[in-house]
Amino acid sequence: MASIKTKICRNVRVEGDVKFGFGCMIHPYAKIIAEEGSSITFGDYNIIEEGVIIKACSKLNPKTKNHESCEINIGNYNHFKIGSYLENTNVDNCNVIDYRAKAVNSYIQSKTVMAPLTQLKEGRVLKESAVFLPQDKLTFNYFFDEGVHEANIKNLVGILEHQFNVAETKK
């Protein structure tokens, strides 16, 4: 079972207003960047693997010509796999963002899977239980077991926290 602290490995870049819930695991070479005036808030038990980039960037409002801040909220029990990229994208609970998947200015609801190398178009909402496949194909997983997913994430965090050279822990 994982501890209640977030584990941040060495060689991780965390900048700006970033908050973590309990039991998160941030692998080496991940980048979590909240630009000035923006923020990123993680829930509990999120796994962020190597090379993942999660950014909150201010956006230019064409009407006012002002830059507006962005607040990203990432729920609980999400797994961001190697090289995935999210920018100004909110994520609900129990999702798998697979290898080198990309989402910009989007919204990912709960219990979804983004397959490897997929890209959500800007402004798109990935609906609950969706499985997003290459070539913009979409199917739905109505048999997703949230309890099993949560248990698997907790077990994985428990294993990983002993495998990495942890630079810091945060309560």
Please provide the spans of the model-predicted regions.
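Extended, small-residue-rich solenoid/repeat segments and analogous flexible loops
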Residues: 1-25, 31
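Generic signal for short, ordered secondary-structure residues
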Residues: 3, 25-26, 74, 91
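Short amphipathic alpha-helical segments enriched in hydrophobics
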Residues: 27-28, 50
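Glycine-rich hexapeptide-repeat left-handed beta-helix
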Residues: 35, 39-171
